[in-house]
From Swiss-Prot:
Species, as recorded: Candida albicans (strain SC5314 / ATCC MYA-2876) (Yeast)
Gene: FLU1
Null mutant phenotype: Increases the susceptibility to mycophenolic acid, fuconazole, ketoconazole and itraconazole. Reduces the efflux of spermidine as well as of histatin 5, a salivary human antimicrobial peptide that is toxic to the opportunistic yeast C.albicans. Also leads to reduced biofilm formation.
Protein name per its UniProtKB record: Major facilitator superfamily multidrug transporter FLU1
Function: Major facilitator superfamily transporter that mediates resistance to structurally and functionally unrelated compounds including cycloheximide but also azoles such as fuconazole, ketoconazole and itraconazole. Also mediates efflux of histatin 5, a salivary human antimicrobial peptide, and is responsible for reduction of its toxicity in C.albicans.
Cross-referenced SUPFAM superfamilies: MFS general substrate transporter
Coarse class of the protein's main subcellular location: membrane
Residue intervals passing through the bilayer: 165-185, 209-229, 231-251, 262-282, 292-312, 323-343, 408-428, 437-457, 478-498, 507-527, 530-550, 573-593
GO biological process: fluconazole transport; peptide transport; spermidine transport; transmembrane transport; xenobiotic detoxification by transmembrane export across the plasma membrane
InterPro entries referenced in this protein's UniProt entry, alphabetically: MFS, MFS_dom, MFS_trans_sf
Residues with glycosylation annotation: 3, 21, 568
Topological type in the membrane: Multi-pass membrane protein
Gene Ontology, cellular component aspect: plasma membrane
Localization, UniProt: Cell membrane
Length: 610
């Protein structure tokens, strides 16, 4: 049995008949639900949870799971009368008991679980009291709880705007606090070196351990949030982040700092996966892409703002380096308060489960149930679905490996600049600490512009999809990357070669180059996820799990060698090296744009539209 993700809830809809051979084929009409369902965009930061593939499934079982077909929708529309809005397939599925039950079992592979249970040789436990086993219920369908149509006020898509904004603010603040925590402590490295008599690399490890923790944490939190709900995962995560942040601030030795930094990142990582899922729970396809793009800008903005706040904090003699963690803990405490007292559960299956519980209590009919109550999760499944198969897929799928490599390089560059910017403006231009970190604002501006450009490209993508008969076009996701690759390379050379000559070049010139770098980072990073999701669809979560592993490795390692590289090679030549790597990766989106479809034809996991 597989654990599931929010992506999977929407990727398998009644209108899709998808068979898995060498290539997964989807007919034009059957794909409409997929093109309408951009819920998979949450995987940009949701990271890995599962796929509908089961390592123990036979080919027949997989076909049975994936054959949740369009006839169900036709029957439903015939019974209800008229079509439901095409942009709300999830509401349509969940508002019909039969579709809801079958969707949940298909997505979570519950059918194979039930078959395994029925075939078990283990004897049933007795009823007790000498009673015989009661007779089986007839049809279970009348007992399945579902939403009362797509306009059900309990469905998160129908929440009032103020409630959606409040919930987004709650989970968004939690995500911002964690992303800031990844970078703010980097400004304390010099003080850490002096106080604990360690070198630069061990001091930088405090940042790398945090990044590795909060980049790999979603491997666990994704499936947990799908099984137990968003809030039940968010609150303990926020609490753990606050506790370990304060533990870092009060630590007496470097070992405690290292350990607590890792656990602050790992335990506090839930907002990175749950926050986009909450947004996807509440927004339909018309607004979901915008919400996720804004969240992406927020997540990238945290590491840009954090060094500025951290530098001025460390510089202030009344505060000092410990307050970089105190501030993170305080912001995290506010997020903890909001998520504890203001956030309510938005995960659709959990809402139905609670409705079923209330109906059982108030009616006394204990046969009433929600499909989600049939599910369970084991550590074995987490390991298989989120570690073993993603790694296998990463190294056997050329599209996934190369795009993930580009994505990981960009992610590593984000944290490499925590060292590069101060070296240029503190070391070359002799700005004081705090002021030397202000150029991060230029990178932030570039990121915000990049986010706006992605929204414009999203409109182009939707129009191209409509012109193509409503069929999804994965290669169209690469257009922002084509632009971002050039702006990133231009920015790297601009920043490095102008920043190396402070006696001849005004400081504003490399600052402008930093804005180009930020713009390129955003234009490359988010479209990489969307392209992977569109290419692998049913296996998107597994593909993104593999992406997360390589991305977290790059994010953790890059800060460790950044200072030595920029010091030994000088700023201009270190930037040249990075720029040349960017040039080598530059053709990738163009190659996949023109040849991606033929590569997908040869893939065991990707799908091709027929």
């Amino acid at each position: 049995m597989n654990n599931n993700t929010n992506s999977n809830h929407n990727d398998i809809a009644p209108e899709a008949t998808i068979t898995q051979n060498t290539t997964t084929s989807v007919s034009n009409d059957e794909l409409q639900h997929i093109t309408n369902n951009n819920n998979v965009n949450v995987q940009s930061y949701v990271g890995p949870t599962d796929s509908v593939e089961s390592s123990s499934n036979t080919a027949d079982e997989e076909n049975e799971i994936n054959s949740f077909n369009a006839q169900n929708v036709k029957d439903y529309e015939a019974n209800v009368g008229g079509e439901l809005p095409p942009d709300d397939e999830l509401s349509r599925i969940e508002s019909n008991t039969e579709l809801s039950r079958r969707a949940t079992r298909s997505i979570m592979n519950t059918e194979s679980l039930l078959r395994t249970a029925s075939q078990s040789s283990k004897p049933l436990p007795p009823m007790g009291g000498g009673k015989e086993y009661p007779p089986m219920l007839g049809s279970r369908d009348p007992y399945v709880v579902a939403f009362d149509g797509p306009d059900d006020p309990d469905h998160p898509h129908n929440y009032p705007t103020w409630k959606k904004i409040l919930y987004c603010a709650s989970v968004g603040l939690a995500a911002l606090s964690v992303s800031m925590g990844s970078a703010m402590f980097s400004q304390a490295s010099a003080d850490i070196m002096q106080i604990y008599h360690i070198g630069w690399t061990p001091a930088t490890l405090t940042t790398s351990l945090f990044v590795f923790g909060f980049a790999s944490g979603p491997v666990i939190y994704g499936p947990l949030s799908e099984l137990f709900g968003r809030k039940l995962v968010m609150v303990p995560s926020c609490l753990g982040y606050v506790c370990f942040s304060f533990a870092v601030a009060t630590a007496k030795d470097i070992q405690t700092i290292m350990i607590c930094r890792f656990f602050a990142g790992f335990i506090g990582a839930a907002p990175l996966v749950v926050a986009p899922a909450v947004m996807a729970d509440m927004f339909n396809n018309r607004y979901r892409g915008t919400a996720i793009a804004i969240f992406s800008m927020l997540l990238f903005g945290g590491p840009m703002l954090a060094p500025i706040l951290g530098a001025f904090t460390v510089k202030n003699s009344a505060l000092g380096w410990r307050w970089t963690s105190y501030f993170c803990g305080i912001i995290g405490s506010l997020a903890l308060f909001m998520n504890t007292f203001l956030l309510q559960e938005t995960h659709h299956p959990l809402i139905l489960t609670r409705r079923a519980e209330e109906l059982r209590r108030r009616t006394g009919n204990w046969g009433i149930y929600a499909p989600h109550e049939e599910l369970k999760l084991s550590m074995k499944e987490i390991v298989e679905n989120n570690i073993a198969r993603p790694l296998k897929m990463l190294f056997t799928e050329p599209i996934l490996f190369l795009v993930s490599l580009y994505n990981a390089f960009i992610y590593g560059m984000l944290y490499l600049f925590l060292t590069a910017i101060p070296l240029i403006f503190l070391g070359e231009y002799h700005f004081v600490q705090g002021v030397a970190e202000l150029p991060y604002l230029a990178m932030l501006i570039g990121i915000l512009i990049g986010g706006g450009m992605i929204m414009l490209f999203e409109k182009r993508y939707i129009k191209a999809m409509e012109d193509n008969g409503g069929k999804i076009i994965p290669e169209k996701r690469l257009e922002p990357m084509m632009v971002g690759g050039f702006t990133f390379v231009i920015g790297i050379f601009w920043l490095g070669w102008t920043g190396n000559y402070p006696q001849h070049v005004h400081w504003i010139v490399p600052v402008i180059g930093a804005a180009f770098v930020g713009n390129g980072l955003m234009l490359i990073f988010l479209p990489c996820f969307n392209y992977i999701i569109d290419c692998y669809l049913l296996y998107a979560a597994t593909a993104l799990a593999g992406n997360t592993f390589i991305r977290s490795a790059f994010g953790a390692v890059f800060p460790l060698f950044a200072r030595q590289m920029f010091t030994n090679l000088t700023i201009k030549w270190a930037s040249t090296l990075l720029g040349c790597i960017g040039i080598l990766l530059l053709p990738m989106p163009f190659v996949f744009y023109y040849y991606g479809k033929s590569l997908r034809h040869k893939s065991k996991f990707a799908f091709v539209l027929e």
